[in-house]
């Protein structure tokens, strides 16, 4: 094996990855639900949970430094959410809209009190029409907390207060309930939180950048239970009426898309029922319903829940609920992507630039792998030294393939050469490369993150294709500097075009990934020269000009 054949191996791995990615996007089987129970139900099965449909009421606006919400006083649902710190597109001044209610698309965070005596129970009539003292709430300068109380009094005189509390700089919305029983019998109520969304995503709301090499992150529902940290639940599964129905303590339910998460977190010590539902008209839902609570006559009880509505910032989500940070979809290489991101974030805390942080992490990764790289080049050098003996053996044995194989293995053993030694470092490097790919595609911190000069978004492709061309040039240089024993004309042609093929591949890759590969190639050039000098001293390498 020599460096040029290694390029061929890498290319084959890339092609395999692209084919696998396309297949996964098309087929993507449902993850195994080991701790859940699924039931087939009819459309609109959220009603079976005592969860109401939306209604018409007065719309009030709530604005903090990072969030702008629209709340419908009919039920107190959040019908719109704007993320003020995250523009819709790189050059846009319009904030990204996470929650939306239009005739074409619905994405809402519903909540309330259901159960036997809950005002949101459809059996008790229309949803409660809350009273509020003003139509706009704005977090003032110097104010750290914004409180929005909604009040409803039923026919029996029972007072239900639903209070939204938002903090400066936060995407966690506390939703509290106060139930004041003015009747002569106990009130039985349960809290619920439900996320509903149109399964088909309009093009205008798609956060995927598109292109041949775009990593399509998971969009759908997810949940966490006491027995399972994180489970995905596809929208298509809900549309097929294969619905989730599981009871658990703690946990959360969520809806995910690239970079952003919405999640309900129950705040109680009892058991909660997690469910999904096909609401009809292409709208799906995931939600929870808490264990019933009895409020005695003349008593007041308080209940709590938390809504996360915003960017998928891992450390902040983990502080809201255990394992909520797992909603950042790093795919099947999450166990590499997560520590890689933590290291990248640590470096960024010093440098303040994600591009330079990627460069530093490249040096760290390649430094750690230097012993393997050295072993790779040593193995390839030994293989080249054995070529005359191997060629003589092949001429001597003719077409006897079995004896050729036996004597070749004996030769490798005698010379202490591992024929696969040149491949092992490549096998190690590919998962790291792909993990970085996942990380760049799923981490909101890298969305619209600028580097230098013309690179204004490391998560998107280079708009002028300069970085891929530079990357191809570094590959070409490595190829020219590497000795070869390849004599087959077809292999020689393939290897000659390899830098061009890779350049085409990388045209649509995230800029941050191309930066990583360019720096990695530059490190390879440096390490290559250092290793060759050592091999020359051992008589395993010659500075003779590479034959073209």
From Swiss-Prot:
Residues 28-52 are annotated as: Disordered. GO terms for biological process: protein insertion into membrane; protein transport. It is a multi-pass membrane protein. Disulfide bonds: none annotated. The chain crosses the membrane at residues 6-26, 345-365, 420-440, 458-478, 499-519. It is found in: Cell inner membrane. Keywords: Cell inner membrane, Cell membrane, Chaperone, Membrane, Protein transport, Transmembrane, Transmembrane helix, Transport. Pfam families: 60KD_IMP, YidC_periplas. Its main location: membrane. GO terms for cellular component: plasma membrane. Gene3D superfamilies: 2.70.98.90. GO terms for molecular function: membrane insertase activity. Interacts with the Sec translocase complex via SecD. Specifically interacts with transmembrane segments of nascent integral membrane proteins during membrane integration. This is Membrane protein insertase YidC. It comes from Klebsiella pneumoniae subsp. pneumoniae (strain ATCC 700721 / MGH 78578).
């Amino acid at each position: 094996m020599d460096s040029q054949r290694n390029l061929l191996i890498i290319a084959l791995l890339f092609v395999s990855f692209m084919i696998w990615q396309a297949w996964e996007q098309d087929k993507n089987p449902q993850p195994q639900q080991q701790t859940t129970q699924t039931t087939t139900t009819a459309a609109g099965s959220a009603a079976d949970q005592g969860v109401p449909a939306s209604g018409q009421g007065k719309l009030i606006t709530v604005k903090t430094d990072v969030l702008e919400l629209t709340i419908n006083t009919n039920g107190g649902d959040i019908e719109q959410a704007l993320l003020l710190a995250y523009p819709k597109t790189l050059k846009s001044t319009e904030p990204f809209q996470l929650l939306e209610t239009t005739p074409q698309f619905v994405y809402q965070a519903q909540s309330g009190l259901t159960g036997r005596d809950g005002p949101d129970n459809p059996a008790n009539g229309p949803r409660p029409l809350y009273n509020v003292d003003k139509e706009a709430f704005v977090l003032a300068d110097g104010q750290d907390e914004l409180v929005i109380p909604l009040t409803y009094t039923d026919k029996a005189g029972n007072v239900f207060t639903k209070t939204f509390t938002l903090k400066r700089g936060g995407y966690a919305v506390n939703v509290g309930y106060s139930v004041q029983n003015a009747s002569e019998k106990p009130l039985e109520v349960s809290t619920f939180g439900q996320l509903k969304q149109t399964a088909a995503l309009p093009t205008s709301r798609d956060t995927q950048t598109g292109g041949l090499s775009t990593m399509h992150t998971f969009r759908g529902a997810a949940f966490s239970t006491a027995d399972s940290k994180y489970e995905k639940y596809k929208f298509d599964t809900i549309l097929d009426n294969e619905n989730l129905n599981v009871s658990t303590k703690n946990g959360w339910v969520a809806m995910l898309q690239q970079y952003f998460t919405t999640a309900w977190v129950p705040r109680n010590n009892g058991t909660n029922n997690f469910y999904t539902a096909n609401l009809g008209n292409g709208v799906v839902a995931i939600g929870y319903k808490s264990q019933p609570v009895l409020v005695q006559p003349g008593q007041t009880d308080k209940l709590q829940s938390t809504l996360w509505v915003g960017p998928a910032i891992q450390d902040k989500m983990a502080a809201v609920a255990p394992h909520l940070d797992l909603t950042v979809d790093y795919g099947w290489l999450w166990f590499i992507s997560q520590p890689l991101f933590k290291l990248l974030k640590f470096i960024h805390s010093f440098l303040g630039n994600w591009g330079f942080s990627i460069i530093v992490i490249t040096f760290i990764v390649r430094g750690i792998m230097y012993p393997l790289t050295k072993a790779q080049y040593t193995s390839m050098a030994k293989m080249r030294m054995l070529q005359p003996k191997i060629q003589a053996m092949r001429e001597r044995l003719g077409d006897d393939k079995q004896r050729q194989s036996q004597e070749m293995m004996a030769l490798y053993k005698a010379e202490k050469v591992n024929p696969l030694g040149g491949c092992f470092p490549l096998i190690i490097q590919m998962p790291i490369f792909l993990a970085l790919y996942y990380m760049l595609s799923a981490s909101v911190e890298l969305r619209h993150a600028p580097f230098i000069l013309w690179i204004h978004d490391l998560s998107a492709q280079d708009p002028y294709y300069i970085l891929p061309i530079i990357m191809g040039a570094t590959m070409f240089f490595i190829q020219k500097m590497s000795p070869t024993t390849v004599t087959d004309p077809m292999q020689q042609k393939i290897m000659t075009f390899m830098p061009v093929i890779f350049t085409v591949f990388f045209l649509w890759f995230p800029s941050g990934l191309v930066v990583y590969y360019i720096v990695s190639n530059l490190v390879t050039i440096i390490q290559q020269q250092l290793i060759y000098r050592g091999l020359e001293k051992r008589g395993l390498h010659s500075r003779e000009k590479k034959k073209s």
